[in-house]
Amino acid sequence: KVFCVDLQLKMLEITEKRARRANLNSRMAFYRCEPDNLSIAEKVDFILSFWMVHEVNDQKDFFNQLPSNLNSGGKILIAEPKIHVTDGDFQQTLEIAQFSGLRICGQPAIRFSHAALFSKNEKKEQFP
């Protein structure tokens, strides 16, 4: 099952409409989150955060929530737009993610994006 989580109701409505047209809506669930809470309890095998982390007010809080939603062996792919996110800002995002209990396990090439693939780090450090 695919869980779609977004702060903007309009984005969820657009996604749900497209899913219905493609006859995929029975495989999907849609959740509106709060600005500081993902508001989802399900554990998943894969989390995709595409071109949105730079819009999060508190990246530490965001990344602290992700490991609890990830199944053992699960992965998280973060992609950020190069047009909005500098190399330095993306490096800072990677550091925050790592201190939140994630380990970089790859940096795939995604067009126009900075990207990193993460898994859970069993030896979680606390972010200061």
Question: Can you say where each PLM-predicted feature lies in the sequence?
Answer:
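A short hydrophobic/small-residue beta-strand
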Residues: 2, 76-77
